[in-house]
């Protein structure tokens, strides 16, 4: 019986009955829950809407988990997300669900107010961001994921052409296992600095001239992108391990160029 609410004592609790098949379930819970959140920024907090996946391990003798308690956890959380708050949510989930292992994943749009390089006009730029966290064998690990759109310009095209060079939008995706709190826009800014040029939501003509020439003066293959971001991540003490991907949506082909680097700095 579920005795957390004395008023429910007389109502049968089927999920709390024993299961005779004796098969443990690695993950059971709720998936694709859209729920508001706030996230920590360098200047304060930012509201957003998260898509949540929340799972726990279910022991072989238990028939079911307490599905409503996942949503109750989201209702109870009023703190802005950072590494410490997110880790606390995972620990609280295990206590509420009476489980010894579990995982929470959340993804959400994140906006940064950016200033154009010449005119100084300001505009919002959106990014795809997420936290993934898991407690297993008593150990907590939290990963910050960011997808950062940038500009890349082809060094070969620049070298062989009398004028101009093909360029395109690229996506740099980093999943970083964190040792300490790392504010989202800190990581995004460090990634953007490795591209041919960063992107902006709004540019005036002097800005467009600047970003065009900036990319032309800073050509990079997809291999250059991942290697330069990897150097940055290798020097970032708050990152323990990472998976790093770059995809160039080639402007002269109907396919993408792609590169990946994975490193666990704890083993290096």
UniProtKB/Swiss-Prot annotation:
Top EC group: hydrolase
EC number: 3.5.4.16
Keyword Hydrolase listed: yes
Keyword entries, A-Z: Hydrolase
Claim: Hydrolase is one of the keywords in the record: yes
Reaction equations catalysed: GTP + H2O = 7,8-dihydroneopterin 3'-triphosphate + formate + H(+)
A Pfam family of this chain: GCHY-1
Site location (May be catalytically important): 154
BP terms from Gene Ontology: tetrahydrofolate biosynthetic process
Molecular function GO labels: GTP cyclohydrolase I activity
Domain of life assignment: Bacteria
UniProt-listed InterPro entries: GTP_cyclohydrolase_FolE2, GTP_cyclohydrolase_FolE2/MptA
Pathway: Cofactor biosynthesis; 7,8-dihydroneopterin triphosphate biosynthesis; 7,8-dihydroneopterin triphosphate from GTP: step 1/1
Entry-linked NCBIfam families: PRK13674.1-1
Similarity comment: family membership: Belongs to the GTP cyclohydrolase IV family.
Functional summary from the UniProt entry: Converts GTP to 7,8-dihydroneopterin triphosphate.
PANTHER family: GTP CYCLOHYDROLASE MPTA (PTHR36445:SF1)
Name this protein carries in UniProt: GTP cyclohydrolase FolE2
């Amino acid at each position: 019986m579920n005795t957390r609410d004395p008023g429910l004592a007389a109502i049968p609790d089927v999920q709390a009955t024993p299961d005779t098949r004796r098969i443990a379930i690695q993950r059971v819970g709720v998936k694709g829950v859209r729920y508001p959140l706030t996230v920590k920024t360098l200047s304060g907090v930012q509201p957003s809407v998260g898509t949540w996946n929340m799972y726990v391990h279910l022991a072989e003798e238990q028939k079911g988990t307490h599905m409503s308690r996942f949503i109750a956890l989201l209702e109870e959380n009023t703190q802005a997300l950072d590494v410490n708050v997110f880790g606390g949510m995972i620990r609280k989930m295990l206590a509420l669900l009476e489980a010894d292992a579990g995982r929470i994943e959340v993804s959400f749009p994140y906006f940064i107010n950016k200033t154009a390089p010449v005119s100084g006009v300001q505009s919002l730029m959106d990014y795809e961001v997420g936290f993934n966290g898991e407690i297993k064998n008593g150990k907590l690990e939290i990963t910050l994921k960011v997808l950062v759109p940038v500009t890349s310009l082809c060094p070969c095209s620049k070298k062989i052409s009398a004028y101009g060079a093909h360029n395109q939008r690229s996506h740099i995706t980093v999943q970083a296992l964190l040792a300490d709190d790392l504010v989202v826009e800190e990581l995004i800014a460090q990634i953007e600095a490795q591209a041919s040029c960063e992107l902006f939501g709004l540019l005036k003509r002097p800005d467009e001239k600047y970003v065009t020439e900036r990319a032309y003066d800073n050509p990079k293959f997809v291999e250059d992108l991942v290697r330069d971001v990897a150097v940055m991540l290798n020097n970032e003490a708050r990152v323990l391990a990472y998976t790093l991907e770059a995809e160039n949506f080639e402007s002269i082909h109907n396919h993408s160029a792609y590169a990946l680097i994975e490193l666990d700095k704890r083993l290096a």
